[in-house]
Amino acid sequence: MKLGYAKNAHQLHFILAFNQNKEKSKGGTYYYDGAQPYKNMQTLWYHYAAQASNFDVSLLFMNLGLETGDAETETSRTRYLQTFGTYVTYQPESGNWLPVQAAFYYQTGKNKNAQSVSAFMASVKAAYAIDKQWSVSLGYDYLSGSDGEGDKFKAFDPLYGTHHKFYGAMDYFYASAWQGVAPGLQDAQLGVNFKTSKQVSMQLNYHYFATAAKLDDVKKGLGSEMDYQLDWNVMKDVKLSAGYSIMRGTKSMDVVKGGDHKRWQDWGWVSVNINPRILFVKW
């Protein structure tokens, strides 16, 4: 359920959610099984965006209930994890700077393993338009990790983020599981965008990955990834996209993700997006 309020530059959303396994005739269990379901969730989101201001600001608070238990004995317990923080964009008034983006989020409470959590993530990205065709961007993401020491679990969980949009197009991180560790992630990015015409654009992005936490006998550097993407607006409502990515990992990548970093790792793809407007009614 979502309740919303909007007036002028202000938006406020309040979201409530509750899940129960439909196949159970009794009880209220919704056991965590490796995907990322939740038993219940409460979220408060506020956004401020004034046309006269160069700032857009979002504030988020989420309380997430994750249920674990024993299906045979039908005993369960719900642990609550809180995530809160802000996302800000700023448009410089002078020059060819594109909007600067920054975010910070903190997690506390308990995870599904009943561990006390103290974790955070931070990110910043800036872009500059050289001319009407060329632009460059620079960014950095930091998601805290856990080294196994202390009484707090320090690895930030991005939960329901659009993982394919971040941390490289090959989805090495967070879209797939770690190899029995939770080292966090550092992602330093450098990108170049080129518009050949109004219909065609290309982008090339470089990522350098490293762990956030220091693990025993493992260096932080994980490797580098290069992502290329071509977008072509063929006609109204039809878009063709294609891309190619390569990853060059290190020995540390073998430890945290498995596999063999010496093997060639690449990925190519082509997609056609057809998005026609079938029916439009204006009251």
PLM regions: where:
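Flexible, solvent-exposed loop segments that connect beta-strands
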Residues: 72-74, 216-217, 254-260
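Signature for the C-terminal beta-barrel architecture of outer-membrane proteins
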Residues: 1-150, 190, 195, 208-210, ...
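Extracytoplasmic loops and strand-loop junctions of Gram-negative outer membrane beta-barrel proteins
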Residues: 27-31, 70-72, 108, 169-177, ...
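A glycine-biased, small/acidic residue-tolerant capping/turn segment at secondary-structure junctions
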Residues: 151-154, 250-260
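Outer-membrane beta-barrel "beta-signal"
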Residues: 263-283
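C-terminal structured "cap/appendage" subdomains that terminate the fold
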Residues: 228-251
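C-terminal structural cap/anchor segments
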Residues: 137-226
